[in-house]
Amino acid sequence: MTYEYILVRYGEMTTKGKNRSKFVSTLKDNVKFKLKKFPNIKIDATHDRMYIQLNGEDHEAVSERLKDVFGIHKFNLAMKVPSELEDIKKGALAAFLQVKGDVKTFKITVHRSYKHFPMRTMELLPEIGGHILENTEDITVDVHNPDVNVRVEIRSGYSYIMCDERMGAGGLPVGVGGKVMVLLSGGIDSPVAAYLTMKRGVSVEAVHFHSPPFTSERAKQKVIDLAQELTKYCKRVTLHLVPFTEVQKTINKEIPSSYSMTVMRRMMMRITERIAEERNALAITTGESLGQVASQTLDSMHTINEVTNYPVIRPLITMDKLEIIKIAEEIGTYDISIRPYEDCCTVFTPASPATKPKREKANRFEAKYDFTPLIDEAVANKETMVLQTVEVVAEEEKFEELF
């Protein structure tokens, strides 16, 4: 007897009201996309739960893809048996025996959705538990802190048996919360900010500023690799590569060095806002953490925010560096981020940047030079690419080869 189903629990989505069907539909669509490489799978999404019928597909491979889908709280590997006592007992034992690791204790949990089942819950517990005890060695019951919880859901005609419970990514399905533009620098912080934004159900497009020849092709590839890594958590990431050399050279020449960092960030915001308007995005996300560097003080953020009417989302604002690194390691972006290639933020770095820049001064310095043509040129010459999960791209290429 093998696992035939995966039962998915929604978590936070269950708090939604009239628009819950939209959340469920989006999650189902995202799951179907992530499981494209498993053609035999069938998915049924109800108001409270999602049922994935494996039809012979490898449950471990499917589980590995499911764990990165936002909107899933937990999921269980399940066996489906007839709602007859002997079948339930055999199924419970089979599921228990498939649990890996050092198992010494267990308990039985029974949920009778089908109230006409001839036995009550308190009668079923010793029957099922006793069958497991009779057919195993050195195993005891522990109802308070068991190594394994054998869950039985009894329905009309059939029952689900579950032992293996796994955590999902949590959050909300990507796509239910609109779209934002993420400033993706290539450092540790901004990919984590993108990940946390997606976790709230928001689609992301990334904007990266590069300044050749001061930044290398390897630095550019590093950002492409980061965007590629983020596709594990969504359908695709659109990456906009913005040429920033002329803007930076002009800032370095025309703006006092203490304000060059502030003005550079303001130019980035202006350009990103223009791209956001083109792409129908509703906000801008950055990887700023309060007080981490000179451009991330409250005074700096206040001055930088002046140039955009878009909401600026800062998911990392109260995190320290170790907290951010921990998430980066967990999501697979850390090793890419620490590749030793410079980005445009490290080019022309001033010796003493202003930590409390004033809006009035920034505006006065910028007024001495017309940056509008440079902004227009940067937006017009951006390079845009769409990145998808490697497995999905491979499947699509394989399909195209048939024609």
From Swiss-Prot:
SUPFAM superfamilies: Adenine nucleotide alpha hydrolases-like (SSF52402), THUMP domain-like (SSF143437). It comes from the Bacteria. GO terms for cellular component: cytosol. ATP binds at L183, L184, H208, F209, R265, G287, Q296. Pathway: Cofactor biosynthesis; thiamine diphosphate biosynthesis. It is found in: Cytoplasm. Its EC number is 2.8.1.4. Disulfide bonds: none annotated. NCBIfam families: tRNA uracil 4-sulfurtransferase ThiI. This is Probable tRNA sulfurtransferase. It comes from Bacillus anthracis.
